[in-house]
């Protein structure tokens, strides 16, 4: 059965970030994506200038009411949320999650708690970080913080892999069953590798891949794609190890393709075949 995912996050007209980054790769893995945009911008904000608007929170709820009105909400297998334009949007998204789960009790909520980036500093509206700590975290089934976001969610520093596993389990005690630490940064084993953790109450998997050097400007949307692809693989029945290994390789293929084409925006279309069947392989290790 094809899985249906309601993806609620940012959208850019030019380039790839949020839904504009994840829709195509998720579809390429065989999922139906229902994109619902929290913001519509001309381009992502790392360019330093952009136009567009943040959607009113009520807009999100109205769109989902429309899907419910045609009796299709029960076919939704998961809600994925990413970049929020405001904390109030987050409250509406939790209402949507409750509505989807009422229609399909098996549905999952995957929260990508976008609050900041180790190299870019915090880039979200006031109240969004607090929303994730107080409301997004306990409501989620799967949550995917980077290192900075993990520290904000668990409210203490995380200095190494062992502490990251313990911090992930602190989050699990508050609601989610699965935590993806989608960028270990300086808490990883090695400074010259990109490392991730996938943690449950009784399992912890670590994986690393080479860093891809883009110089001063790192492409935007890598975390968005990582979260979206992981959700698809888990919904399709992959084990934690299989999901983590495929996602790591697929994202690496996108990065390598983007660099080879000397582009700044993620080249998800050019890399599409390698997203579905990566040519590289990285082995996850059980901790």
UniProtKB/Swiss-Prot annotation:
- Is this entry keyworded Nucleotide-binding? yes
Pathway info:
Cofactor metabolism; pyridoxal 5'-phosphate salvage; pyridoxal 5'-phosphate from pyridoxal: step 1/1
Locate the residues binding ATP.
112, 144, 149, 182, 209-212
Q: Reaction catalysed?
A: pyridoxal + ATP = pyridoxal 5'-phosphate + ADP + H(+)
Q: Which GO terms describe its biological process?
A: pyridoxal 5'-phosphate salvage
Cofactors that this protein relies on: Mg(2+)
Which keywords fit this entry according to its UniProt record? ATP-binding, Kinase, Magnesium, Nucleotide-binding, Transferase
Q: What does this protein do?
A: Pyridoxal kinase involved in the salvage pathway of pyridoxal 5'-phosphate (PLP). Catalyzes the phosphorylation of pyridoxal to PLP.
The Swiss-Prot or TrEMBL record describes its family as follows: Belongs to the pyridoxine kinase family. PdxY subfamily.
Q: What protein is this chain from?
A: Pyridoxal kinase PdxY
Which gene is this protein's source? pdxY
């Amino acid at each position: 059965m094809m899985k249906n995912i309601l993806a609620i996050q940012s959208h850019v007209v030019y380039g790839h970030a949020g839904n504009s980054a994840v829709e195509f790769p998720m579809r390429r893995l065989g999922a139906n994506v229902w994109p619902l945009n929290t913001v519509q911008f001309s381009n992502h904000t790392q360019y330093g200038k952009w136009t567009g608007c943040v959607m009113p929170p009520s807009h999100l709820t109205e769109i989902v009411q429309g899907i419910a009105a045609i009796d299709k909400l029960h076919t939704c297998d998961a809600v994925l949320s990413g970049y929020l334009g405001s904390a109030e949007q987050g409250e509406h998204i939790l209402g949507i999650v409750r509505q989807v789960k009422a229609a399909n009790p098996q549905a999952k909520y995957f929260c990508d708690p976008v609050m900041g980036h180790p190299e870019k500093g915090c880039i979200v509206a006031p109240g969004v970080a607090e929303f994730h700590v107080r409301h997004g975290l306990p409501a989620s089934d799967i949550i995917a913080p980077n290192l900075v976001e993990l520290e904000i969610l668990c409210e203490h520093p995380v200095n190494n892999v062992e502490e990251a596993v313990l911090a992930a389990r602190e989050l699990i005690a508050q609601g989610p069953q699965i935590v993806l630490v989608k960028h270990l940064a300086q808490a990883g084993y090695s400074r010259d590798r990109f490392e991730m953790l996938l943690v449950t109450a009784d399992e912890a998997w670590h994986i690393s891949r080479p860093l891809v050097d883009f110089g001063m400007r790192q492409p935007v949307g890598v975390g968005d794609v990582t979260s979206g692809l992981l959700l698809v693989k888990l919904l399709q029945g992959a084990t934690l190890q299989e999901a983590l290994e495929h996602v790591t390789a697929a994202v690496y293929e996108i990065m390598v393709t983007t660099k080879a084409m000397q582009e700044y925006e993620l080249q998800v279309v050019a890399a599409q075949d390698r997203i579905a069947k990566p040519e590289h392989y990285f082995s996850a290790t059980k901790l």
